Amino acid sequence: MILSFAACASDKSGSDTTAASDIKTDAATAPAADDSTTAPETTEPATSGTDAVSAAPSVRRGPTKTTPAADTTKPASGGNSGSTTVPSKPDDSKPSAVETNPKKIIVSAEKEWIFTEKPTDSCHASTVLPLDNGTVVAAWFAGSSESDDDVKILTSVRGTDGKWGEPIRVSADPNVAHWNPVLFQNDDGTITLYFKVGKDTEYWKTYYSVSTDGKNWAAPRELVPGDNSGGRGPVKNKPIRLKNGTILAPGSTELGGKYRCFVDISTDNGKTWNRTPEINSTFLGFFKTPMIQPTLWESKDGSVHMFTRTKVGKIYRSDSYDGGKTWCSAYPTNLPNNNSGIDLDTDDSGRIFLVYNPVGIPGIRTPLTLAVSLDDGKTFTKIKTFETGLAEYSYPAVVVKGDIIHITYTYERDYIAYWQIKIK
């Protein structure tokens, strides 16, 4: 299936012109800165295409849990892990992927578990970062349950032998919940781990820790000391570095239960940040569209784009033509969204690889699917489905490095799955 939509048209100065026409697709290829800046308005986007799901997910049970007799699991180092159980390992005998690779983009795909003995009762919101030395760093939040005080950030490193190391705890406050880690590597090789701290999303503050190897982390520090906006810097998905060296961090807040997106901009390698105004958008002509957790990419012409999670059944998109300083009003794509996290990345040729739950509102967070765009985000073709069970498979993170796509995601809030997908 190919999904298509039109971008907001804009000239190089950032001012909007006319609406783009409907994108035509070949049916034969279809498979089953500154706080004072203002965002320009956009014309109404075209809405051609379809968001129909080609097949309903099959029923499949998740890993069976056993009743804990005692707290015998080994907690991760670095602090109190909270209560633990003794679950069974994930069941790899169940089919979990549906291959729909029409253009033969995928050469091979291998699935792993970052851990099979749960260090905590619950886990969610992973992030992944492959390094030049062949190792892979992952992080996620874990504890009794989301928002509980014992929820902290756990990290693990996959060695060149293909084995994941013991999870390591990173904590800025032992008495407050931690959320949504994001990994990013600077040009000098330093790894930065961003994460949120706060009992509730309204009161988030952003902290960061640095490392040279993903195993040893410096004491966390607040990203923007004194900020009370509900969190600065990246909120779920990784920052991107533009061709000119500027770093854009996709951010959002949930103050008063209102979903609002913005971009944090750094021109000094992450030392200081300037927040853009909220990205404008309207739903049904007058309501502000509830949008959070954007994911970004830069096109070959230097324009920058975002997709966002929403509460209105569609992924929304916005575009910038001045390096992320101003953004056109966000508009709906034809990609469905069930108020669940998404992520994407580009390869060296400009192909965009998007991981998402292709389900509208209402809908549970399944299936979880990989789609590719060969035309800079105008159309997407599904090429792989990772999970199809009637459970939660969500919050993907994706990084393309060379000819390998690295993907992590939440598996039923019990495990973190990791995929290596070789592409051509």
Where are these regions (language model features)?
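Short, low-complexity, disordered segments immediately C-terminal to signal peptides
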Residues: 9-37, 42, 50
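Intrinsically disordered, low-complexity sequence elements enriched in Ser/Thr/Gly/Pro
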Residues: 10, 22, 38, 58-59, ...
